[in-house]
Amino acid sequence: MTEQKLSDNERLKRESNFLRGTIADDLQDRITGGFTADNFQLIRFHGMYQQDDRDIRAERAKQKLEPLHNVMLRARMPGGIITPTQWLAIDKFAEESSLYGSIRLTTRQTFQFHGVLKPNIKLMHQTLNSIGIDSIATAGDVNRNVLCTTNPIESELHQEAYEWAKKISEHLLPKTRAYAEIWLDGEKVEGGDEEPILGSNYLPRKFKTTVVIPPQNDVDVHANDLNFIAIADNGKLVGFNVLVGGGLAMTHGDKTTYPRRADDFGFIPLVNTLEVAAAVVTTQRDWGNRSNRKNAKTKYTLDRVGVDVFKAEVEKRAGITFEASRPYEFTDRGDRIGWVEGIDGKHHLALFIENGRLLDTPGKPLKTGVAEIAKIHKGDFRMTANQNLIVAGVPAADKNKIEKIARDHGLIDDGVSEQRKNSMACVAFPTCPLAMAEAERFLPDFVTDVEGVLAKHGLAEDDNIILRVTGCANGCGRAMLAEIGLVGKAPGRYNVHLGGNRNGTRVPKMYRENITVPQIMDEIDQLVGRWANEREDGEDFGDFTVRTGIIEPVLVSKRDFYA
């Protein structure tokens, strides 16, 4: 690190007394519905973001009222597994104690509560704690929720991978007692807080980790700082290939920021997993940029110091030498919607949840439907990184019962197209303070329009496009790994990126900047027309746009993304 002035977030963390700040005092202040000064940032380390309802912000200002401050909470659920008992408890809390009455499944393979007012925040944490859930470190400059491929078919392998996701999450978790003290009325103990892995100033920026079972890339490895690719021998997990330095966030107009693929460091046996995880995190802790938060993520550290230098430091700290990577291949990222049978004879029902939003609407009481399933289900639920929900471990005798509940509540709809199943958006308006354009509320009608274009050009149901919309350049909707990625620029305007591929191993490049939705549809119409007429046999849309020179491929992000 060069000696530059540290960002103010570094002061904030240093002075926070291991993430306590004055959050407890702020909770008692009912003059404002929000958190003040440093606490606005510090609550992120406890899994919350302060938000407000942007649909009514101007009206409240007219009435001389502050914005309707509330928090969004993101739960820590390594691997996305939740029991029916836990589900019924979160369903009840969302219904009774949040402004929107919904549960939002997210691209981080967990659930979010939106619209929780200050008087209900402590109740929320205590409710979660009573069912064995917390939200420690799901936001802020820490290792966040650890993702794991939801592979219900290879049940034994999935169980092993899931156990590692949990172990990695626990190993990298903050050790401060602040969460228990503030939210769970834990006993205050003077001194003694230590953070051997994260350090007293925590990480320079957010850090994301996955465990993935090829050939499924449902967790999108290249969106994450640290990835453990499961390598199996005769169905048994023997170790991991380690990929480091992925990430999708960027800043509009700042060409020192860009999405980037992760680099393959090599193979490690299982016994070295936790040491390597800690070594990658501590190297980024010590070498990451603490002066400019826009360049603070692991991907920029790798590009600044060099992949080989970073890798050698990880080897030194972990006391290992990476072996050559073992062969693997990604073939798909989508969830297998519908029923599948695992090798253990259990059945699993993957439900497509558009945008991950579980809410009761006229004719589609989705949230109630999942709760009704939870009342009789003997297995567990698995949230996916594609914002869907798997009813897992269903005995053959219960299949018909569970399918009937799902159909009666609109959770199974045979009319949903493959295109819709392969489309995704982040939350954006009205709750996300960073959103520049609509995403979740925009996507359903946009997909309908794209379906019309595909039909117009005579394309079959299987001929669909990985389509993603994100409301700003931070990339929660993972548009920077889509075949067509829309990035919000202003209300009704988006940058359009082309050239990603179906298995999520290529970053798309900007094709059109700051254009309106009608202009976007014109562009898609022309592009799909060309694809239908000029493609090679079975050629996917993203590969077609690269092969025909419509867009140049991004091979090295730092060099190619803006070229």
From Swiss-Prot:
Coiled coil: none annotated. Its cofactor is siroheme; [4Fe-4S] cluster. PROSITE patterns: NIR_SIR. One of its GO terms (cellular component) is sulfite reductase complex (NADPH). Siroheme binds at residue 476. The keyword Ribonucleoprotein does not apply. [4Fe-4S] cluster binds at residues 426, 432, 472, 476. It comes from the Bacteria. Its EC number is 1.8.1.2. Pathway: Sulfur metabolism; hydrogen sulfide biosynthesis; hydrogen sulfide from sulfite (NADPH route): step 1/1. It catalyses: hydrogen sulfide + 3 NADP(+) + 3 H2O = sulfite + 3 NADPH + 4 H(+). Keywords: 4Fe-4S, Amino-acid biosynthesis, Cysteine biosynthesis, Heme, Iron, Iron-sulfur, Metal-binding, NADP, Oxidoreductase. One of its GO terms (biological process) is cysteine biosynthetic process. Binds 1 siroheme per subunit. Binds 1 [4Fe-4S] cluster per subunit. InterPro entries: CysI (IPR011786), NiRdtase/SiRdtase_haem-b_fer (IPR005117), Nit/Sulf_reduc_fer-like_dom_sf (IPR036136), NO2/SO3_Rdtase_4Fe4S_dom (IPR006067), NO2/SO3_Rdtase_4Fe4S_prot (IPR045169), NO2/SO3_Rdtase_4Fe4S_sf (IPR045854), NO2/SO3_Rdtase_FeS/sirohaem_BS (IPR006066). GO terms for molecular function: 4 iron, 4 sulfur cluster binding; heme binding; metal ion binding; NADP binding; sulfite reductase (ferredoxin) activity; sulfite reductase (NADPH) activity. Belongs to the nitrite and sulfite reductase 4Fe-4S domain family. Component of the sulfite reductase complex that catalyzes the 6-electron reduction of sulfite to sulfide. This is one of several activities required for the biosynthesis of L-cysteine from sulfate. PANTHER family: SULFITE REDUCTASE [NADPH] SUBUNIT BETA, SULFITE REDUCTASE [NADPH] SUBUNIT BETA-RELATED. Alpha(8)-beta(8). The alpha component is a flavoprotein, the beta component is a hemoprotein. This is Sulfite reductase [NADPH] hemoprotein beta-component. It comes from Photobacterium profundum (strain SS9). The gene is cysI.
